Regions:
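Conserved N-terminal/central alpha/beta ligand/cofactor-binding core
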Residues: 25-135, 146, 158-175, 182-187, ...
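Beta1/beta-strand and adjacent pyrophosphate-binding region of the FAD-binding site
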Residues: 7-21
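Core beta-strand elements of the Rossmann-like FAD/NAD(P) dinucleotide-binding domain
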Residues: 9, 145-154
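An anion/pyrophosphate-binding glycine-rich loop and adjacent beta-alpha core
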Residues: 42-44, 60, 87, 188-327, ...
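Internal hydrophobic alpha-helix adjacent to the cofactor/substrate pocket in enzyme cavities
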Residues: 385-406
Length: 628
């Protein structure tokens, strides 16, 4: 007999899924005044971290800052629930500095659930969405497993790895989402019927082990940064920060690798059971051992999952090998001899859309009013998901209410770069944001995300009064200090005394503070020792000012390089060009260029995995070849 549908509600925007993408989409849409509902299979899985218990990292930390600058929630949640904070890549230039925190999984979920509950105009429903309703090429609503029908002007799909989810551990497999959630199979069929081009991707996660079973005396300790140096993600966070836990590093060894290789055919990855494509930049431990056969060891980062749990996460050791093999190879590692696995490592295969079927607004070209975000769009990572969620939710709300939609250009943000890569190049494997993907990375730093994006967030209605006031206050402090540095002259004697006191060779002459700050050996704190700290200037703002002044010339040069690349787009590439000899290219670019053999630079730049900086390297090599 035909199902009788019960009409249960009318909304402007419906969001399917309440993971990292769904949270930001629902929050953004409701904040813009759209009547919004978010559907999740379980209220207890809102903001769940089924993989690493951390936020941020290289390029990802910048995405979180950008999200925050636009009015998102992730930065505030990370600041409220972190256990340990570290600034990565501090020994490198400011373009790649990256904030990363260990978070308390349970507290993060609780924070996010409460944040959604406190969002005005947002309804939260625990129900599985089994289908979308489409009429004349436009989405009209959703249907739930309980025969509930909800109409909507726009729908955002943020299903994570639940869509057609299938978990593999050795030769055992079962239909499932992450962390024991059930798979969303009916929705896959509905989306296929609507004409969406779906494909299969795969990801994996390591085992969770019991703290008491680890001998930490055999591991390297990895403390967080000194409390005095800790920085928040959110531009709104003012509270002092303190590290609460330590992380640790263990290493695989030749015996670990032997056990893995002896059992490699028992991995569903190598036994042909998994058809989905895995993430290039987050390989399983068996992938690492096979692909990097010359390496004697690989690091495994041992990270706590929370303050009130004994579960430890083994970052860098994801696997889909059977449990007996997992026990054997983990126990071959120093410090893990008596390891107790609480949750085995597994691989998960899932359905996602070909992102070239999306507009730059993240709206589907196939079904109007339907938006995609997160792993559904072919990306990997909480931060990539959250950033897309905000953009999709914002645009869904604007569309539902008849407003113009937001397209972020590459030069504005990592989020703009990510979306442009997705919809222009497409993806062959789960996409991870990296600094090398942006040709504007000197200007797209984590410290100036507010300057780049908060005015845009304000214009589109996401940035509320408190954030706008804080932003304007920060800008006025920075402008006043730039003026002061431009107008203040340091006497040679004062400067030399300050340099001597700092243990530096006092070779510099005095001069205008701004000009002196361009010199590599002179820092803002050193100058401030002579002329005093500017009013309202914190160590974070001082670092930002110093970067902008020191790197002004490099930024101008980078802009010229980008223009040169554009001019050379019609340059032909010889058919016999040896990409393997071009060490400036990333390994991924070399592989894909060799495989596809593009005819010209323009074609090369459109190949997934070939970044604009790879194109620049190629352009230089072709120019050199032409001259020789």
């Amino acid at each position: 007999s035909e199902k009788v549908m019960n009409h249960l509600g009318d909304y402007d925007v419906i969001v399917i899924g309440a993971g990292h993408a769904g949270i930001e989409a629902a929050h953004a849409a409701a904040t813009l005044g759209a009547k919004t509902a978010v559907f999740t299979m379980s209220l207890d899985a809102i903001g769940n971290m089924p993989c690493n218990p951390s936020i941020g990292g290289t390029a990802k930390g910048t995405l979180v800052r950008e999200l925050d600058a636009l009015g998102g929630v992730m930065g505030l949640a990370a600041d409220a629930t972190y256990l340990q904070s570290r600034m990565l890549n501090k020994g490198k230039g400011p373009a790649v500095h990256a904030l990363r925190v260990q978070t308390d999984r349970k507290r993060y979920h609780e924070y996010m659930k409460h944040a959604l509950e406190l969002t005005p105009g947002l309804a939260i429903h625990q129900a599985e969405v089994v289908g979308i309703e489409v009429e004349n090429g436009h989405v009209k609503g959703v249907v739930t497993q309980l025969n509930g029908e909800y109409s909507a002007k726009c729908v955002v799909i943020a299903t994570g790895t639940n869509l057609g989810g299938k978990i593999f551990v050795g030769d055992a497999w079962y239909a499932s989402g992450p962390d024991g959630m059930h798979a969303a199979n009916a929705l896959t069929e509905s989306l296929k019927a609507a004409g969406l081009p779906l494909r299969r991707f795969k990801t994996g996660t390591p085992a969770r082990v019991h703290r008491r079973s680890i001998d930490f005396s055999k591991l390297e300790c990895q403390p967080g940064d000194p409390d005095s140096e800790l920085q928040p993600f959110s531009f709104l966070t003012d509270a002092p920060m303190h590290n609460k836990v330590e992380c640790w590093i263990a290493y695989t060894n030749p015996e670990t690798h032997r056990i893995i290789l002896d059992n490699i055919q028992r991995s569903p990855l190598y036994g042909g059971m998994i058809e989905g494509v895995g993430p290039r930049y987050c390989p399983s431990i068996e992938d690492k051992v096979v692909r990097f056969a010359g390496k004697d060891r690989h690091p495994i980062f041992v990270e706590p999952c929370g303050e009130n749990t004994e579960e430890m996460y083994l970052q860098g050791a994801s696997s889909s090998l059977p449990e007996d093999v997992q026990n054997a190879f983990y126990r071959s590692i120093q410090g893990f001899e008596h390891i107790e696995i609480m949750r085995p490592a597994y691989a998960i295969e899932y359905d996602c859309v070909d992102p070239t079927s999306l507009e730059a607004t993240l709206e589907s070209k196939v079904v109007r009013g339907l938006y995609g975000a997160g792993q559904f769009n072919g990306t990997s990572g909480y931060e990539e998901a959250a950033a897309q969620g905000l953009l999709a939710g914002l645009n869904a709300a604007r569309s539902a209410k008849g407003g113009s939609q937001l397209i972020l250009e590459r030069q504005t943000s990592y989020l703009g770069t990510l979306v442009d890569d997705l919809v222009t190049k497409g993806v062959m494997d789960p996409y991870r944001m990296m600094t090398s993907r942006s040709e504007y990375r000197l200007t797209l730093r984590q410290d100036n995300a507010d300057q780049r994006l908060t005015p845009i967030g304000r214009e589109y209605g996401l940035v509320q009064d408190d954030r706008w006031a804080k932003y304007q206050h920060t800008q006025s402090i920075l402008e006043a200090e730039r003026r002061r540095l431009h107008e203040t002259h340091l006497r040679t004697a004062d400067l030399r005394a300050a340099m001597e006191a700092a243990g530096l060779t006092p070779a510099a002459e005095g001069g205008i503070a701004e000009e002196l700050l361009r010199r590599p050996e002179i820092s803002y704190p050193l100058l401030a020792g002579v002329i005093g700290w500017g009013e309202g200037i914190t160590p974070m703002l001082a670092e930002r000012l110093e970067t902008e002044i020191k790197y002004a010339g490099y930024i101008a040069r980078q802009d010229r390089m980008i223009r040169d690349v554009a001019r050379h787009e019609k340059t032909l590439i010889p058919a016999d060009f040896e990409y393997a000899d071009l060490t400036g290219l990333t390994l991924e670019a070399r592989e894909k260029l060799t495989g596809i053999r593009p005819k010209n630079l323009g074609q090369a730049g459109r190949i997934p995995g070939v970044s604009p900086s790879d194109v620049a390297q190629l352009s230089i090599a072709l120019t050199v070849r032409e001259k020789t």
